[in-house]
């Protein structure tokens, strides 16, 4: 098998693979030119859970010669898919961490990141899309657009990632690609257009017809190249109709193809393969259209044409505009466009950290310049310089050592102390990449080691997990002394508790899951507060006048200084600002963070001797409490968007279950004998739902959920939470 890293240089590098004692392969490499970048594709494979992402990646690796055998995600052989390298992934049949690999297709090279589909691990998708140039959005041919599909679409838009769609599982009963395309248009507002037509339905799926080449592809046993044939006679008219739709859709957003049609008597003359392919490529990279391909990864149908589509339609690193910020001038950031040039100063982004067999692995995307083993580079965010000890390319859990990597490449470094999202550059360069979006945790629980012997490893594990995953948070509750971990959901936290046991040999005791409640006000609340303390010697004095009201920036808090003149000097204003930050960390109602509050200081008074920063910080706490109580305070709870799929026969039971949990069904979709409910349910009422749904549907129902919004709790729950907090404080003060 030809290595990606050696072969990508047009055959100039000498292939020299040898098994080292440490289990890492070594590759001798020569330098490369910018021409090699145009043959490179960095793609992510993303989808809703169970749409077949990992199965598709397994086929891609097999057809490109990267692996010798195909293993299924939940295969009877117990091996599991190549990209699911964690024991937990193989046991649960889901992807938990994004996994990187690379392969060769024709004369082109593809870096692939297979991402999780479960919403609890959405940060893995977020950071993958942050560093990729293109993506394959995998859709289930039966279920179509699902909740996590919508989330992934939002993430792709956030990072301006062009994508192609692969409608998978067309061999399953009820599969309909045209329904899925219509959902892409209506639910995701994508200009989706089919490039293929399937031959056969469901279990009779034989292949696909390529609308660009107007050739049929029939797929045999796994590993065999598709047989290219003329279009079957019973498909000719339908193919003609779909090709017309394809050309007209592209022409509507591409002036070049539109002009060709005018000049060449369209539709009497159709664009040739070269003209149409170029137009699809232009509009895909510009994110004006989303090409749709079809097949069944499990049945080995449509995978090779998808690989062709990745090369034909998705951008190379030098075709995507990458912006960095020049921080060389203090307090002034200037946007600069990076170039995929190996001779330019090195710029790379650490997008993922992982505890490997040989220490911490730092995954790096190289945007500009060349990174070599032994180089001294700068961590712009931390202001530290480091020497690169080792460079590797990842193939799932396996590592292959390399001496250098160039622009567009994805690699990993050993033994580098940094955080996810840090930018590394050449020593004389001060560029930094823009940060990635990190969602706020929605659930917490208390955790402690079962025995004191495990304390050291417990602390080490928490520290490592925080570095690896920005959505995994750890804090110490000052009142109870408990360690509280927070994350994106039950499964997210469950996985980390299990990893602590397996990887660090620490048995833990966990408390009941805690919901991420928030506190806020519903109207303006005024304050006129004086803090005065005299106990001999210098006293304390601070007076503050102002108000608190709802913030105009949604859930964000704001501090506004409206003091005219020097009624409160600037040094004390800073103390008030710090005091406000203290107040919003722990609200006065139930001790949860405060959100959506604008705190305004309009006047005040000082004493020439007794006023101090401490006095004003204490006064802020009193002023905030006074305004908060006057502002009709309330508690907000997280509402989850829940999608439940089930056979129609269990409809009544499941609806009753949603109602019991105080949920609201906002949409119902019927597909054959199956139903999908879209609901909005308070997170506090979703605990244990997985077990209940299995019981109600005889194991045939499934659900997914993601955070939607925070909204006011009911009056009943409001009073209950206040009472519980009061009891807790009483117990702690005994």
Curated annotation (Swiss-Prot):
GO terms for cellular component: mitochondrion. Keywords: Elongation factor, GTP-binding, Hydrolase, Mitochondrion, Nucleotide-binding, Protein biosynthesis, Transit peptide. It comes from Dictyostelium discoideum. Gene3D superfamilies: 3.30.230.10, 3.30.70.240, Elongation Factor G (Translational Gtpase), domain 3, P-loop containing nucleotide triphosphate hydrolases, Translation factors. Residues 1-32 form a transit peptide. SUPFAM superfamilies: EF-G C-terminal domain-like, P-loop containing nucleoside triphosphate hydrolases, Ribosomal protein S5 domain 2-like, Translation proteins. This is Elongation factor G, mitochondrial. It is an enzyme of class 3 (hydrolase). The keyword Transit peptide applies. Its main location: mitochondrion. The keyword rRNA processing does not apply. It catalyses: GTP + H2O = GDP + phosphate + H(+). Pfam families: EFG_C, EFG_III, EFG_IV, GTP_EFTU, GTP_EFTU_D2. The lineage of its organism: Eukaryota, Amoebozoa, Evosea, Eumycetozoa, Dictyostelia. Residues 38-318 form the tr-type G domain.
């Amino acid at each position: 098998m030809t290595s990606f890293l050696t072969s990508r240089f047009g055959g100039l590098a000498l292939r020299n693979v040898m098994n080292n004692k440490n289990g890492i392969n070594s590759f001798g490499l020569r330098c490369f030119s910018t021409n090699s970048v145009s043959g490179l594709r960095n793609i992510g494979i993303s989808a809703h859970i169970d749409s077949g992402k990992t199965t598709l990646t397994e086929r891609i690796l097999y057809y490109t010669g990267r692996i010798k055998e195909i293993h299924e995600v939940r295969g009877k052989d117990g091996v599991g898919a190549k990209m699911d390298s964690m024991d937990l992934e193989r046991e649960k049949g889901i992807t938990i961490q994004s996994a990187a690999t690379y392969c060769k297709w024709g004369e082109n090279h593809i870096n692939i990141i297979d991402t999780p589909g479960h919403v609890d691990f959405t940060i893995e998708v977020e950071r993958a899309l942050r560093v990729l140039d293109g993506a394959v959005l995998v859709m289930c041919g039966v279920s179509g657009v699902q909740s996590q599909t919508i989330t992934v679409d939002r993430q792709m838009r956030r990072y301006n990632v062009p994508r192609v769609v692969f409608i998978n599982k067309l061999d399953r009963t009820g599969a309909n690609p045209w329904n899925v395309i219509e959902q892409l248009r209506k639910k995701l507002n994508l200009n989706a257009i089919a490039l293929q037509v399937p031959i056969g339905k469901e279990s009779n799926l034989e292949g696909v017809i390529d609308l660009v080449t107007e050739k049929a592809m029939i797929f045999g046993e796994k590993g065999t190249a598709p047989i290219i044939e003329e279009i079957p006679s019973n498909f000719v008219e339908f193919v003609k109709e779909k090709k017309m739709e394809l050309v007209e859709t592209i022409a509507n957003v591409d002036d070049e193809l539109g002009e060709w049609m005018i000049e060449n008597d369209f539709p009497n003359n159709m664009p040739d393969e070269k003209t149409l392919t170029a137009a699809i490529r232009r509009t895909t990279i510009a994110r004006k259209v989303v090409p749709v391909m079809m097949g069944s990864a499990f049945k080995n149908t449509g995978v090779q044409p998808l690989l062709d589509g990745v090369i034909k339609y998705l951008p190379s690193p030098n075709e995507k505009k990458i912006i960095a910020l020049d921080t060389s001038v203090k307090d002034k950031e200037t946007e600069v466009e990076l170039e995929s040039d190996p001779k330019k100063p090195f710029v790379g982004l650490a997008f993922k950290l992982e505890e490997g067999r040989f220490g911490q692995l730092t995954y790096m995307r190289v945007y500009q310049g060349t990174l070599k083993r032994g180089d001294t580079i700068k961590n712009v965010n931390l202001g530290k310089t480091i020497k690169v000890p080792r460079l590797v390319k990842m193939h799932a859990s396996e590592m292959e050592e390399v001496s250098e990597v160039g622009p567009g490449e994805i690699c990993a470094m050993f033994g580098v102390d940094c955080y996810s999202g840090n930018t590394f550059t050449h020593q004389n360069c001060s560029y930094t990449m823009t940060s990635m979006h990190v969602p706020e945790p929605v659930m917490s629980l208390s955790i402690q080691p079962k025995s004191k012997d495990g304390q050291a490893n417990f602390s080490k594990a928490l520290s490592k997990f925080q570095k690896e995953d920005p959505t995994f948070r750890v804090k110490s509750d000052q009142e109870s002394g408990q360690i509280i971990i927070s994350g994106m959901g039950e499964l997210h936290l469950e996985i980390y508790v299990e990893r602590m046991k397996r990887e660090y040999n620490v048995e833990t005791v966990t408390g009941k899951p805690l919901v991420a409640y928030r506190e806020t006000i519903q109207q303006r609340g005024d304050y006129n507060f004086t803090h005065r303390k005299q106990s001999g010697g210098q006293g304390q004095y601070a007076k503050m006048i102002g108000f608190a009201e709802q913030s105009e920036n949604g859930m964000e808090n704001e501090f506004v200084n409206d003091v005219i003149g020097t009624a409160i000097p600037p040094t004390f204003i800073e103390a008030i600002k710090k005091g406000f930050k203290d107040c919003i960390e722990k609200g006065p109602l139930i001790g949860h963070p405060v959100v959506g509050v604008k705190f305004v200081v309009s006047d005040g008074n000082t004493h020439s001797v007794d006023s101090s920063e401490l006095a004003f910080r204490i006064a802020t706490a009193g002023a905030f409490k006074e305004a908060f109580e006057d502002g009709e305070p309330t508690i907000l709870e997280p509402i989850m968007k829940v999608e439940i799929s089930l056979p129609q026969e269990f409809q009544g039971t499941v609806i009753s279950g949603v109602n019991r949990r105080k949920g609201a069904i906002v949409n119902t979709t019927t597909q054959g004998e199956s139903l999908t409910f879209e609901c909005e349910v308070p997170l506090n009422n979703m605990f244990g739902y997985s077990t209940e749904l299995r019981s109600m549907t005889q194991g045939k129902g499934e659900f997914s959920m993601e955070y939607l919004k925070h909204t006011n709790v009911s009056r009943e729950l409001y009073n209950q939470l206040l009472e519980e907090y009061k009891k807790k404080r009483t117990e702690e003060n005994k």
